[in-house]
């Protein structure tokens, strides 16, 4: 039996697709075992994670967010995954170089997989209009992928509709020399982890209460994967991967106002993934790929203080794409046609939501709110056509050129639907309905045309290369003509790649948020007995954009040490936020979106690693140390994004001083300085691989909004919003993964892996409230992973 391995490499710009798609780049498992190493930090801003990189890293729930967690350009929302909710398996939000997490672009094989319906809303609260979403349209299982490339700076001109970065996932192609089937199982549970809980939260946590936070004191996670690679005919074959990731969480069914628990129930959190690619190497000139993809996510919830509030919330995405590569005499032409359906939904068990002064649930009586608000969903169908022409390299005098041109058209058919009528009201002491609102059944849509043209040229003279490019985008949603200049230069000082400098300027225009257009459609189905109405205005918005100045340095020190340094400066303009006002005459609440948001970010990282591993007694050792610093200031909450309503405030009180709001450090994703030591050990004779990450994070701050009852509130500044920062201590964490692939098994390739996250069981505070209640990161966690390849 043979095992396919792809050596870990760093790829850049236009070379990525060609290098990754080369069908002859495979080598045999029993001839040489891969030496695992930390993923290098590139100077050109493009980090490439091979399938071996994915196997090496402890990837937790197996999402793309987990894979990118240690990347120095990335910051996680430390308050999203904590000791309180470790049963959750959804992808976490990521910020790239200080940009909002909803302004990243996700792609699968080069086709957009971004959910731009309402990506900043990840609330699971029960509401008549709440449809939770996130920017990842497909919740991919990274164990099924061939590779993932993160473009965080110097992003090539073919990528657009983002402010932060681009994440491009590639599905595996078949390998004629490796017909095989692989089975995998991965698991953890609440008994295998340590939870750090504030004393003030312990009672609610142990009950498994829910509300703004869905506690998971008791859970089991079981992940199953199946993948295969099969040649069907000469030069024609298929790969496929299936996975189910499931978390079963036991929570309180109902908790009374007196804290009495009336029963417990099990709630499921499930993510299914199915990926397949048919490949036909028709000739030396033509290659065809047909890709099929599906992910489905469902989460069962209740609000434990509201009886009969059970609901299911989820996401379903599926699509197909056809790629044709044509090798011409003078160029390479790639044509892609695709269709993707991305949807989010909320489905309550009941259609009526009401509050009554006296209700009975089991043995509990008293005032309560109960019920649900029906079934509501929104979706978008994207129809994509794109083409790209790469000229062969040619010379004009002593200068070589390698230009490429491209065009893309996407038609987006977005719609929202309320599948049944629902209503909400309050029953007063007299037994009459008040605050009565009816949500009528309905469906509405909007269609958007998106056009893109781009071109770039790699110009080389001696040991200097320039990459000028320009991108044009237009859509009829906001009707803005956006021109994005892209420029990068590389100087190989001694023409031997020992000393290199990379620098450039780039502009990145963001993507549209479709919920702004769909919101008025949903609002038109709402009938308030009191006559209240809502209206949304967004039509005059500019497209938000980021300007980037970046520089990278690479220096080989001695024979085997490589040092790399990167600096990225980002300035975000025209970021979307909102303001609301009420017209009392018409009883209309008007929400107006504006371009008042702005941020400035300084990002720096420095890394040291070896060009070749150390060899000590049949053990290959690969060390790497990374220093990373990201600091942002601005008047925008990255988490709230376009739902942020504070940006109209020119001044605020910050730590007791009246200051300009845009001079205040950004509060979320605020983990400025991180230092990581990565150390991998590979013992080839036994098949043992031991990967380690030791990370130190400096003390940071949590932002608190002051109310008039807080001691730090300054009454003379009562006309201004007031904030203070509370210090959170520094932290040291150690994550490790030990894998064993017995070399004596010739017919079955068995791999057993164990992950220990936070080996030191560090108690790290990630947030605090204005009453001093702290939230902590998860403690020590064990995972077990077994796979077998036939």
PLM features: residue spans?
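Periplasmic N-terminal accessory/gating domains of Gram-negative outer-membrane beta-barrel systems
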Residues: 22, 39-156, 166, 170-172, ...
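Surface-exposed extracellular loop regions of Gram-negative outer-membrane beta-barrel proteins
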Residues: 123, 298, 476, 494-544, ...
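Transmembrane beta-barrel wall of Gram-negative outer-membrane proteins
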Residues: 179-180, 213-298, 315-332, 397, ...
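C-terminal beta-signal and adjacent terminal beta-strands/loops
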Residues: 116, 578, 687, 695-714, ...
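Gram-negative outer-membrane beta-barrel transporters
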Residues: 460-465, 567-576, 583-708
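Face-selective signature of the C-terminal outer-membrane beta-barrel domain
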Residues: 275-298, 311-478, 603-613, 617-628
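Transmembrane beta-barrel strands of outer-membrane/channel proteins
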Residues: 181-189, 240-244, 290-296, 335-341, ...
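N-terminal Sec signal peptide and the immediately downstream disordered periplasmic leader
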Residues: 1-60, 65-72, 131-134, 226-230, ...
């Amino acid at each position: 039996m043979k095992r396919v391995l792809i050596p870990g490499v760093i790829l850049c710009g236009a070379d990525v697709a060609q290098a990754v798609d080369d069908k002859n780049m495979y080598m045999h498992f029993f001839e040489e075992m891969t030496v695992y190493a930390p993923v290098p930090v590139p100077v050109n801003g493009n980090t490439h994670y091979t399938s071996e990189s994915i196997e090496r890293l402890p990837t937790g729930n197996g999402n793309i967010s987990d894979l990118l967690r240690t990347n120095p350009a990335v910051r996680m929302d430390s308050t999203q995954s904590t000791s309180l909710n470790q049963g959750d398996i959804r992808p976490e939000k990521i910020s790239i170089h200080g940009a909002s997490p909803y302004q990243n672009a996700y792609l699968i094989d080069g086709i957009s997989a971004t959910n731009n319906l309402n990506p900043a809303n990840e609330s699971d609260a029960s509401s008549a209009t709440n449809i939770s979403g996130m920017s990842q349209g497909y919740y991919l299982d990274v164990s099924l992928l061939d590779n993932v490339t993160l473009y965080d700076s110097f992003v090539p001109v073919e990528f657009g509709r983002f402010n932060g970065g681009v994440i491009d996932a590639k599905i595996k192609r078949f390998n004629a020399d490796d017909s095989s089937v692989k089975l995998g199982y991965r698991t953890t549970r609440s008994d295998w982890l340590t939870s750090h809980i504030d004393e003030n939260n312990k009672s609610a946590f142990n009950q498994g209460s829910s509300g703004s936070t869905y506690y998971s004191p008791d859970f089991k996670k079981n992940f199953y994967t199946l993948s295969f690679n099969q040649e069907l005919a000469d030069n024609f074959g298929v790969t496929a991967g299936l996975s189910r990731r499931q978390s079963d969480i036991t929570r309180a069914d109902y908790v009374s106002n007196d804290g009495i628990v009336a029963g417990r129930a099990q709630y499921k959190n499930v993510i299914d993934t199915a990926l397949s690619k048919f490949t036909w190497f028709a000739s030396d000139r033509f290659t065809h790929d047909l890709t099929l993809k599906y992910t489905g996510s469902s989460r069962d919830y209740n609000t434990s203080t509201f009886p009969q509030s059970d609901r299911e919330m989820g996401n379903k995405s599926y699509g197909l794409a056809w790629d044709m590569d044509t090798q011409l005499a003078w160029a390479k032409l790639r044509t892609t046609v695709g269709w993707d359906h991305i949807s989010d939904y909320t489905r309550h068990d009941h259609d009526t939501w009401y509050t009554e002064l006296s209700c009975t649930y089991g043995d509990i009586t008293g005032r309560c709110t109960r019920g649900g608000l029906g079934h509501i969903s929104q979706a978008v169908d994207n129809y994509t056509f794109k083409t790209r022409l790469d000229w062969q390299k040619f010379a004009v005098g002593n200068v070589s050129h390698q230009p490429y041109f491209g065009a893309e058209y996407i038609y987006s058919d977005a719609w929202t639907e309320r599948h049944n009528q629902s209503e909400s009201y309050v029953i007063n002491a007299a037994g009459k309905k008040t605050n009565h609102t009816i949500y009528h059944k309905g469906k509405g849509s909007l269609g958007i045309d998106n056009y893109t043209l781009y071109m770039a040229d790699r110009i080389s003279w001696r040991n200097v290369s320039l990459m000028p490019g320009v991108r044009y985008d237009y859509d009829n949603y906001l009707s803005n003509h956006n021109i994005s200049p892209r420029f990068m230069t590389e100087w190989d000082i001694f023409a031997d790649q020992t000393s290199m400098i990379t620098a450039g300027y780039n502009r990145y225009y963001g993507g549209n948020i479709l919920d702004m257009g769909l919101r008025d459609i949903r609002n038109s189905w709402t009938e308030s007995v009191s006559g209240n109405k809502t209206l949304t205005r967004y039509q005059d918005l500019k497209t938000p954009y980021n300007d980037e100045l970046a520089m990278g340095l690479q220096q080989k020190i001695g024979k085997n040490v490589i040092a790399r340094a990167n600096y990225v400066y980002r300035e975000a303009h025209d970021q979307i936020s909102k303001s609301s006002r009420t017209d009392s005459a018409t009883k209309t609440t008007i929400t107006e979106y504006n371009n008042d948001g702005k941020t400035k970010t300084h990002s720096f990282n420095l890394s040291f690693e070896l060009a070749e591993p150390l060899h000590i007694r049949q053990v290959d050792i690969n060390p790497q140390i990374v220093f990373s610093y990201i600091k942002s200031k601005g008047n925008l909450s990255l988490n709230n994004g376009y739902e942020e309503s504070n940006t109209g405030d020119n001044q605020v009180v910050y730590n007791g001083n009246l200051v300009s709001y845009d001079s205040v450090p950004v509060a979320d994703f605020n983990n400025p300085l991180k230092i990581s030591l990565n150390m991998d050990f590979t013992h080839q004779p036994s098949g043992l691989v031991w990967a380690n990450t030791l990370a130190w994070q400096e003390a940071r701050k949590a932002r608190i909004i002051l109310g008039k009852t807080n001691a730090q509130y300054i009454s003379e500044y009562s006309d201004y919003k007031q904030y203070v920062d509370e210090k959170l201590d520094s932290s040291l964490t150690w994550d490790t993964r030990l894998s064993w692939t017995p070399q004596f098994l010739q017919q079955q390739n068995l791999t057993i892996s164990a992950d220990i996250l936070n080996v030191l069981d560090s108690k790290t505070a990630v947030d605090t409230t204005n009453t001093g209640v702290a939230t902590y990161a998860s403690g020590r966690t064990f995972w077990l992973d077994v796979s077998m390849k036939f």
